[in-house]
């Protein structure tokens, strides 16, 4: 394809040379001038450029391939035969001319990997000799195989490189033989052969083969592979429990070592057996804590600061004034409650009011309390007053009426609003809660009562507390048994 074809495709009119004779002459002169030869580009590709000639033409400067082709000659390859085995001949390509390879005996390049096991070889007389000698030395009347069968077995082992499954599959001399019988006979003959040749050979014990042990191993492996999913899960759970016991034993030993390191000096006259029990360890731990607290106390009191002493006196006076004011309000409230609950009859004598001197003496004799103690005392007195008021309201109800109406006197503070009795059932930590649920399932009881009446909820709560107590006792017992096992 030339540039004129491209112009025709793009519908471009080329420049005409008829109206301009000078230009045509110049073009003719230019066409007569020889064009420089362009290398590195195909002629057809160069013709497609048209008037848009590139300023620089990329030319390859490397002559490596040309030089390589000119300097080297192709090496000859010959298709020759080689012997893979004495019975099989194959062909392959070998580098070199046929004349050079004719006088050589070609061998396979993989012949070096064809290694055979070196098994003992013996004649029938030698076999009878060392077998009789071994039987005489061992004083055993064990039956032996014939020489032909032993030779047949050794030929199979030599051919299949002691691959026992293949040897057993190809063994046709006596089909009643098992794989264990074949292996036992092979190692027995080898051991007796080397004992006759070199009795002091240290490799003789490695030729011992136990047929019974191999049978037991295969039976155990068969049972292991035929386990069900439940048996596998049970074994994994037992392994986890054993690891937990091991970790608990290690932790107990570490705690014991850390506690023994806290001792200041070893007591030579004391018996170590008293610290091997849990009671002895608890006693030792309490003694160490008491010694540590006793040593923290200063031997002598620090010097007294007069400014701090004055501030303490001001604080004590302020506390006394607040306490007096509080007691005054409490007495006034108590009198109002007594007037409401037990009104004074006209004929009853009035109680003697406390005299000012007695009141002052009682206030001076009152102990000094801090802010926290005063708040606790106020809370206790308020609860006592509420309980007395509730008891006064409920004294007109009998026990049957209280039970039928569901009226009870709570000692604890309840949240405001309506709630379910089942929501007040005791709950525990997740680890303890799971154990409690398992115990309830063993007893055939639901986790939450179906009819949560007041009596049922009370008995259920009491049952849960007893279960937790029993679980705690069981945990302590397991810990003591683990300690006994560690001591043993």
Curated annotation (Swiss-Prot):
GO terms for biological process: chromatin remodeling; chromosome organization; DNA repair; negative regulation of transcription by RNA polymerase II. Its main location: nucleus. It comes from the Eukaryota. One of its GO terms (cellular component) is NuA4 histone acetyltransferase complex. One of its GO terms (molecular function) is transcription corepressor activity. Keywords: Activator, Chromatin regulator, DNA damage, DNA repair, Nucleus, Transcription, Transcription regulation. Belongs to the SWC4 family. This is SWR1-complex protein 4.
């Amino acid at each position: 394809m030339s540039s004129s074809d491209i112009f025709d495709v793009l519908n471009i009119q080329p420049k005409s040379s008829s109206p301009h004779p000078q230009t045509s002459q110049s073009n003719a002169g230019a066409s007569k001038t020889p064009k420089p030869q362009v290398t590195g580009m195909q002629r057809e590709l160069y013709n497609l450029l048209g008037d848009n000639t590139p300023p620089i033409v990329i030319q390859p400067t490397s002559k490596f391939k040309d030089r390589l082709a000119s300097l080297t000659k192709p090496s000859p390859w010959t298709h020759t035969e080689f012997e893979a085995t004495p019975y099989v001949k194959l062909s392959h390509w070998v580098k070199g001319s046929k004349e050079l390879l004719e006088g050589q005996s070609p061998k396979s390049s993989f012949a070096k990997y064809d290694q055979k096991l070196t098994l003992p070889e013996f004649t029938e007389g030698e076999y009878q000799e060392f077998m009789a000698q071994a039987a005489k030395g061992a004083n055993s009347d064990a039956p032996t195989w014939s020489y032909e069968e032993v030779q047949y077995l050794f030929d199979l082992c030599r051919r299949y490189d002691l691959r026992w499954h293949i040897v057993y599959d190809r063994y046709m001399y006596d089909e009643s033989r098992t794989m264990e019988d074949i292996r036992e006979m092979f190692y027995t003959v080898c051991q007796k052969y080397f004992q006759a040749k070199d009795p002091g050979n240290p490799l003789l014990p490695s030729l011992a083969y136990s047929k019974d042990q191999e049978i037991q191993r295969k039976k155990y492996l068969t049972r292991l592979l035929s386990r069900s999913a439940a048996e596998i899960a049970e074994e994994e759970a037992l392994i986890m429990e054993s690891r937990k016991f091991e970790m608990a034993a290690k932790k107990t030993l570490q705690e014991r070592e850390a506690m023994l390191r806290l001792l200041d000096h070893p007591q030579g006259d004391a018996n170590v057996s008293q610290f091997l029990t849990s009671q002895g360890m608890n006693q030792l731990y309490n003694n160490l804590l008491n010694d540590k607290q006793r040593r923290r106390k200063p031997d002598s009191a620090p010097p007294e600061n007069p400014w701090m002493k004055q501030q303490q006196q001001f604080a004590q006076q302020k506390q006394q004034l607040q306490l007096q004011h509080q007691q005054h309000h409490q007495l006034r409230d108590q009198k109002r409650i007594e007037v409401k609950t037990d009104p004074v009859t006209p004929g009853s004598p009035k109680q003697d009011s406390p005299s000012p001197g007695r009141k002052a003496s009682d206030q001076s004799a009152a102990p000094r309390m801090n802010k926290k103690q005063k708040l606790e005392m106020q809370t206790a007195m308020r609860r006592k007053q509420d309980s007395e008021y509730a008891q006064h309201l409920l004294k007109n109800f009998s026990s049957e009426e209280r039970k039928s109406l569901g009226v009870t006197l709570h000692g604890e503070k309840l949240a405001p609003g309506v709630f379910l009795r089942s929501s007040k059932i005791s709950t525990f930590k997740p680890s303890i809660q799971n154990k409690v649920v398992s115990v309830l399932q063993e007893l055939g009881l639901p986790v939450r009562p179906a009819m949560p009446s007041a009596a049922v909820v009370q008995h259920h709560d009491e049952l849960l507390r007893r279960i937790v107590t029993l679980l705690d006792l069981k945990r302590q017992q397991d810990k003591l048994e683990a300690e006994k096992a560690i001591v043993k």
